[in-house]
């Protein structure tokens, strides 16, 4: 169980590092955020089943629902940005430009 937790924490850390490294492109950032949410989902589900805390067994499902909503909003933003500007650079998302 300890090696599984370590692998999931490493996956989360690598996805977080990916967000920090590839923050100029929106698509890369969205993929790294999805990796973070997936590793959190698996880690939460494993910890709940390991410690027999079935009173909070709906928490991973709620996290998965919020992750799907985040992915939908992110993809809508990606489509809108790429159709307006022709690329997925995050610099185009400055709302103070006129």
From Swiss-Prot:
Enzyme class: translocase
Membrane-spanning residues: 1-21, 28-48, 59-79
One MF annotation (Gene Ontology) recorded for this entry: NADH dehydrogenase (ubiquinone) activity
Ribosomal protein listed as a keyword: no
GO biological process, one term: ATP synthesis coupled electron transport
First-listed, main subcellular location of the protein, grouped into a coarse class: mitochondrion
Catalytic activity: a ubiquinone + NADH + 5 H(+)(in) = a ubiquinol + NAD(+) + 4 H(+)(out)
A GO cellular-component term linked to this record: mitochondrial inner membrane
InterPro entries on file: NADH_UbQ_OxRdtase_chain4L/K, NUOK/Mnh_C1-like
Subcellular location: Mitochondrion inner membrane
EC number: 7.1.1.2
Protein name: NADH-ubiquinone oxidoreductase chain 4L
Organism: Pseudocheirus peregrinus
Gene name tied to this protein: MT-ND4L
């Amino acid at each position: 169980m300890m090696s599984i937790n370590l692998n999931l924490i490493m996956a989360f850390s690598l996805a977080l590092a990916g967000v920090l490294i590839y923050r100029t492109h929106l698509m890369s950032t969205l993929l790294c955020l999805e990796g973070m949410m997936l590793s959190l989902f698996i880690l939460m589900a494993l910890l709940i089943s390991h410690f027999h805390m079935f009173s909070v067994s709906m928490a991973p499902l709620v996290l998965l629902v919020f992750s799907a909503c985040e992915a939908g909003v992110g993809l809508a933003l990606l489509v809108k940005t790429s159709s307006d500007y022709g690329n997925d650079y995050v610099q185009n998302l400055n709302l103070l430009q006129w």
